[in-house]
Amino acid sequence: MKINKFAKAISYIFDGSYISIVAYLSINIFMLKTAREVAIWTPICILFGSIMPFVFVVFLYKKKIITDLHVPKREDRLKPLIVSNISYLLGYFIFYILKAPIYLRALFFTSFLTTVLLTLITSFWKISFHTSWITFTSITYYVFFGKWFLFMLLLVPLVGWARVKIKRHTIGQVIAGSLLAFITASFGYSFFHLMNMYRI
């Protein structure tokens, strides 16, 4: 019973809706030169990268269209994913129009790319979002903070174990989620010539 509670806690802690807010704030504090810049760009990141997708999920929950904020049923995940795709794309174009720092455009482009592929796969198979986003965050931290943050990838097996333990995913689904994010994050940041910021 205690193990199940621990697995559920891990599942909630590493939900993409929460870790994305921490990620945006920490990345902007590190990458930007002034508090003013952080105050300008961070709210836009959080609005389009966290709040809009999460608010739509809450809306579906309040309307009783879904029964769980983690959206366990595969077929129920498609609408939130579509909204997430739109939100990331809007965020990217806003950053492009406002001539935001290149890393922000890269971050939202890569998030959009990852979510599009998650949507396509989810249309026929339940892939893990949790392992996808913790892997995505790990690669993102590596790109922006340096090689030591690759150790964050050690969290992937923990999150994957938790999702399997509470019977939300199979082992194959958690591995697939992580692998997908690893590929899309590596490609996306390479496309913007950011992967060579740090070398192992």
Task: State each model region's role.
Residues 1-8:
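Short, Lys/Arg-rich, polar N-terminal cytosolic tail immediately upstream
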Residues 10-31:
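The first (N-terminal) embedded transmembrane alpha-helix
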Residues 19, 82-93, 113, 132-135:
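Core segments of transmembrane alpha-helices
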Residues 28-40:
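Short, hydrophobic transmembrane alpha-helix segments
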Residues 38-52, 110:
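Alpha-helical transmembrane segments
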Residues 67-84:
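Juxtamembrane helix-capping/reentrant segments at transmembrane boundaries
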